[in-house]
Amino acid sequence: MHTIWFYSVFFLVIIHDGKTYSRSSQWHNNGYNAWSSKYKMLTNVYEGKNLEFGFPSDDDRKTALRKGLYDPDSPLPIDVDVYYPPSGEEPRIFVTIPRFGQGVPYSLAYLTNEVRPNGTELQPFPDYDWHKSHGDDCDGLTSVYRIQIDTCGKMWILDSGEIEFKQHCAPQLVVLDIATAEVKHRYRLPKGMYKPTISRFVTPYVDIADPGPYGSCKEAFVYMADPTGTGFVVYDVKNERSWRVENKYTYPDPDFGTHTIAGESFELLDGSFGFAVTPRGLGLRRMLYFHSLSNDAQVAIPLDIVNDPAYWGNGIKSAMEHFVLLGKRGVQCAAPAMTSSGVFLCGHLEPIGIFGWNIFTPYTYQNRMLLAENPTTLQFISGLKVITNPQGKEEVWLVSNRLQKAFSGTMNYNEINYRILKCGVDELLLGRPC
């Protein structure tokens, strides 16, 4: 049975298995609702001072170092996703490491059980050959920012095609069978869908009409964020057709171009960045929720509009009357995620934490709850997922990476810089220990 969450200004009411529970909240000194506990400790899955890359052989490692293709101080993890094998084996945890510089030996990896001095060892996925050309082979993977794993055991990979912000290959969407590494689908974006030397595709969001275990996950729309190109691309997988959405709602706001995290600031003007959609079965018109990283506006548009190419032939004037400005946060929000009951989660920069908003309520500060605050462990949540485990329980998984220190050059590799954390959705929303 689904858990149903009702938010009001001061109370969270839960109806679960026929019983009703409530939990009061306290008014936070920044004007947000917050639970009474000061700092939330999520379950620590991984932490590292730096990333530990494994190689097929010691010779491969030495070659990468010699050619400048591996710089231990260059990589930065951006996203995380989890695959629970149907056989009941231990979950596989995947991370992305975009090639901001030349020194990233591979851009998509999984965590092993091998612990090394700086953290758990990574290994390339699907294998080293997919990454070793460093942009010379566009049938491989060049630079992956984020991924999404579906309920059919497939990984949807958005490859920006860049290394050190230079376009080597066209941006592409690659769908791999996780168990076999077989390519199930590939779509290279046509030139009309991206802006050469400007675009940078960083986030895919896949909305699937025929999910597993009974469906094949082939009827899907994919929304691909292009923050530097200030827009996003919609891709109809079944018909292999795409169109671009770009207007004032997908742009950055200069007033939010300065990002401050834990007292350190950097400048970044990024447009469209993160997506979520209305879950099925809630009785609502389904919407695509999106926001720009360098903006405080939360925007929505009906899925039946954004998924129809007939609306998108008039440039920046296309379908303007269908966009809904839900509200403004007054602060930047990075990676979002959505629970099955309609709680929109996002990692805010200030205060440093995860906020929740019930989509049945207006997007106001009274209805945005500070669910987890931790100025140490949650410094820039660059990847955030809601994943259903084999027991049917929803979990929040995230990666935090202290992005401000990478931008300012103050990363201290004697400290823990990167974390993968998780918490049950029920525990997060109820303020219980993870």
Task: List PLM regions with ranges.
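Beta-rich, blade/repeat-based domains predominating
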Residues: D71-E90, H134-M155, M193-V222, Y251-M287, ...
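Beta-propeller blade signature
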Residues: Y106-R116, A170-E182, F232-E240, N412-L428
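Blade-level signature of beta-propeller repeat domains, shared across WD40, Kelch, NHL, RCC1
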Residues: I381-C434
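Cleavable N-terminal signal peptides of Sec/SRP-targeted secreted and luminal proteins
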Residues: H2-T20, L173
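Short loop/turn segments immediately following beta-strands, especially the blade-tip
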Residues: L111-P117, A179, V237-W243, I301-N314, ...
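Blade-loop segments of beta-propeller domains
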Residues: L76, S107-E164, Y187-G192
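Beta-strand-rich domains and repeat architectures in extracellular enzymes and scaffolds
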Residues: S25-Y106, Y145-R146
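Surface-exposed loop and turn segments in beta-propeller and other repeat-based domains
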Residues: K38-D71, G119-D139, V183-S199, S242-E267, ...
